[in-house]
UniProtKB/Swiss-Prot annotation:
Residues 1-21 form the signal peptide. Its main location: secreted. This is Astakine. Cytokine directly involved in hematopoiesis.
Length: 124
């Protein structure tokens, strides 16, 4: 019976250590965590928390030249978070839309103007 108790305690200790190693702050550490139709964003303020945000829809605000970034964040509680494929402030537009340089909004692409930003520019 003493061996059984020791095994249980060891199992619980392993679970606690495993859970502590998987700590994550916010919704995401990569856009892949957010699923289709969303991306991982981090705000502009110090100690912002990563969150999943919907991709820009027609007429939504967007940021021209906002490529995905890899960031290493440190928080006052000692937690460090590595973000990959994440965006500052807002997600890019949906794939069928483009961020207009003139209006900074998601619009349908138009071949006749140079005012559109192709979202696929930063994709592999």
């Amino acid at each position: 019976m003493a061996v059984s108790s020791a095994v249980r305690m060891l199992s619980v200790a392993c679970l606690v250590v495993s859970a502590a190693g998987m700590r994550r702050l916010g919704d995401c550490s990569s856009s892949a965590d957010c699923g289709p139709g969303a991306c991982c964003t981090i705000g502009f303020n110090r100690y912002s928390i990563p969150q999943c945000t919907p991709l820009g829809d027609l007429g939504d605000w967007c940021r021209v030249m906002n490529p995905p970034r890899e960031l290493s964040l440190a928080y006052p509680n000692g937690l460090q978070v590595l973000l990959t494929d994440s965006y500052h402030g807002m997600c890019p537009c949906r794939p069928e839309l483009a961020c207009s340089r003139a209006t900074s909004t998601c619009q349908l692409p138009q071949e006749s103007t140079q005012h559109q930003e192709d979202n696929s520019l930063y994709k592999d």
